[in-house]
A protein has these predicted regions:
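Small-residue packing motifs within transmembrane alpha-helices
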Residues: 7-11
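Bacterial N-terminal signal peptides that target proteins for export
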Residues: 1-6
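Subset-of-secretome marker
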Residues: 18-324
Length: 324
């Protein structure tokens, strides 16, 4: 069972941690738009799920500096003589400054035992990106210009939206008011818009692509055949439309294997605001970027080309942001 269920679990983690092209579509949701960098657009509370399409920069324009955490637990179980359960956990944390600097970390424990967990942390401070893998030293990333750092941050921050995408049509029903961090908030109850509604279809396999192997076939079976069976949750929105707290508990079946059940629980919340959020500072004594093989660097230096290379500004890669 563990071999059968684990690919499904990894498919879910891949879908949740790599938000992909759906981000652009999500940001076009009604109610999600933002104005220029100084003034966010008025939020449309008739479409509260649009709040989950706001990125971290959008939210900081509405709330100022903030600290945010999220935990996501995925589990896959299968009934029968070989019944077993596989579990994985994601943990995310973001500190976002109103100045645009940020610190983000993401960890995944795939449930495979000691040493299987992995993670990454990225800091964007003072126009420089710094990154490290879990247990590794900090390194500078001078060629990033913030693009990859922001993508990594936004993948974490969009975790609630990614989970709800697996659920298909979702209803958000007004459920009164609450107070979060001393701020008034509107509460919405989350549920499936129609019982047993199919989730969006997975992208079609490219023409001419080779037949998938056994594990890939299991992943595709879930992504293409998942059936949302239940959803219970709540969404609390600030008066500006920024999401202050999200809770989601959802379950899925698989069309071609009724013995398989997948469940996910997510809890995300803003933990601090304004002066409660520590300043975003560069890490102490980061190492230089070492992604260029040492042998290549040595050969350039020996040939007298390294100084010239360092003196000439690097050409921006396609899609890079302007240097800051």
């Amino acid at each position: 069972m563990r071999r059968a269920a684990l690919p499904i679990l990894l498919a879910l983690l891949a879908g949740a941690c790599s938000r992909g092209a759906d981000e652009d579509a999500a940001r076009r949701l009604p109610g999600a738009g933002a104005g220029d960098a100084g003034e966010p657009a008025a939020f449309d509370f008739e479409r509260p799920l649009g709040a989950l399409a706001l990125d971290s920069d959008d939210v900081s324009r509405r709330l100022g500096s903030f600290e945010w955490t999220a935990g996501v637990e995925w589990s896959v179980s299968r009934q029968g003589d070989d019944a077993q359960r596989v579990r994985a956990v994601e943990r995310h944390r973001i500190r976002q400054s109103a100045t645009g600097d940020f610190d983000v970390s993401a960890d995944v424990d795939p449930g495979l035992g000691p040493g299987s967990d992995a993670g990454k942390e990225v800091i964007r401070a003072g126009g420089m990106t710094y990154a490290r893998a879990k247990y590794a030293p900090w390194r500078e990333r001078p060629t990033d210009r913030g693009r990859d750092a922001r993508r990594f941050r936004d993948e974490s921050f969009s975790a609630p939206a990614a989970v709800l995408r697996h659920c298909g049509a979702v209803a958000a029903t007004p459920a009164g008011e609450a107070t979060v961090l001393g701020r008034p908030a509107r509460r919405y109850r989350l549920s499936l818009a129609a019982a047993g509604a199919d989730a969006p279809a997975a992208p079609a396999r490219p023409a001419g692509a080779p037949e998938p192997d056994e594990d890939t076939s299991r992943r595709l079976a879930f992504l293409e055949g998942r059936i949302p069976t239940s959803l219970d949750g709540e969404l609390l929105l600030d008066r500006s439309g920024a999401p202050l707290r999200v809770r989601i508990a959802a379950a899925f079946g698989v069309r071609d294997d009724p013995r398989v059940r997948t469940a996910v629980e997510l809890s995300a919340q803003v933990k601090g605001l304004g002066g409660e959020v520590p300043a975003i500072l560069p890490p102490k004594s980061p190492l230089p970027d070492a992604r260029k093989p040492a042998g290549v660097a040595g050969a350039l230096e020996a040939a007298g080309l390294r100084k010239k290379e360092e003196a000439t500004p690097a050409r921006a890669e396609p899609g890079d942001e302007p240097a800051e």
